[in-house]
Amino acid sequence: MSDKKPSLSYKDAGVDIDAGNALVERIKGVTKRTHRPEVMGNIGGFGALCEIPAGYKQPVLVSGTDGVGTKLRLAIDLKRHRGVGIDLVAMCVNDLIVQGAEPLFFLDYYATGKLDVDVAADVVAGIGDGCEQSGCALIGGETAEMPGMYEGGDYDLAGFCTGVVEKSEIIDGTKVADGDALIALASSGPHSNGYSLIRKIIEVSGADLESHLQGKTLADHLLEPTRIYVKPVLELIKHVPVHALSHITGGGFWENIPRVLPKGSKAVIDGNSWDWPVIFDWLKENGNISMKEMYRTFNCGVGMVIAVPNEQADKAIQILTDAGEDAWKIGRIANAAEGEEQVDILADETH
């Protein structure tokens, strides 16, 4: 007579449905604090419903998706999870605002080897913080516990956001003209890009993440959440004709600014118009990184670049300053010769 086979459960395979349900209960308060009047129903359904806000004549939906990249490795190792929730939202909504869109709703995907409810709830609380900062509703998401796919409690994140813009008010760079002023918005640090290089610099330099730079630990500088520009930029758009916006993310200045410039134009950047935040000087020195590599990898203290008519530059800077941003004139638009690069950074090698 053969031995009776054990009765297996999903939990035996490493998936805890009860933990997933506990997480849903924990995050219901987060969705409530991000609620918008257009949202219909509550979380937990098969799909989330959202009306288009009233007042749009020809509404165009704008969507985007992004992640946080290897900044997550630092956050996991240092057990500091809430900030990367803000990062996740920021990377999505800042891309939407580039086209003039008001973010409406956000969904997240959280994948892990073993679900730690406290860690996941901390991340989602940060997502709620980011949604509040951008006026965006957190309306749903997916938590995937996948043993064998991720090591232990390691996790990955993806965000999905949808916004709306009036068709006649889409910002697509077609109005960019010779002589336009370029306005910079300060970043809060590296944001969510360049962290594979940052982690390599930490490795080769043997840096102590608890060492201090200008009153903050290195860890604090590196895990500072990505700045969200939605509300200040929406306010600017109401009062100034914005010709283009560029979110300075992966690829830095060299890759992102040309994405919003018409053929035959270039951005002339005065690299001496601002002082880099100390973390970028630290990265350059400890990684022995060239200036060109810095500008093509990191934001170097600039999270967003905005093109406006030159005569509107002072007004634009004042509006952004009043909204709490550190804004300044960083350069101008000029004509580009055939085959010429679309970004020209004039700066001292040592900065």
Swiss-Prot record:
Gene Ontology cellular-component annotations: cytosol
EC number: 6.3.3.1
Pathways involved: Purine metabolism; IMP biosynthesis via de novo pathway; 5-amino-1-(5-phospho-D-ribosyl)imidazole from N(2)-formyl-N(1)-(5-phospho-D-ribosyl)glycinamide: step 2/2
InterPro entries per record: PurM-like_C_dom, PurM-like_C_sf, PurM-like_N, PurM-like_N_sf, PurM_cligase
Record keywords, A-Z: ATP-binding, Cytoplasm, Ligase, Nucleotide-binding, Purine biosynthesis
This protein's record includes keyword Kinase: no
Ranges that cross the membrane: none
Main localization category: cytoplasm
Cellular localization per UniProt: Cytoplasm
Superkingdom of source: Bacteria
A Gene Ontology biological process term: adenine biosynthetic process
Gene Ontology terms for molecular function: ATP binding; phosphoribosylamine-glycine ligase activity; phosphoribosylformylglycinamidine cyclo-ligase activity
Top-level EC class as recorded in UniProt: ligase
Pfam families reported for this sequence: AIRS, AIRS_C
Record field: catalytic activity: 2-formamido-N(1)-(5-O-phospho-beta-D-ribosyl)acetamidine + ATP = 5-amino-1-(5-phospho-beta-D-ribosyl)imidazole + ADP + phosphate + H(+)
Cited PANTHER family: TRIFUNCTIONAL PURINE BIOSYNTHETIC PROTEIN ADENOSINE-3, TRIFUNCTIONAL PURINE BIOSYNTHETIC PROTEIN ADENOSINE-3-RELATED
Protein family per UniProt: Belongs to the AIR synthase family.
Protein name: Phosphoribosylformylglycinamidine cyclo-ligase
Organism: Idiomarina loihiensis (strain ATCC BAA-735 / DSM 15497 / L2-TR)
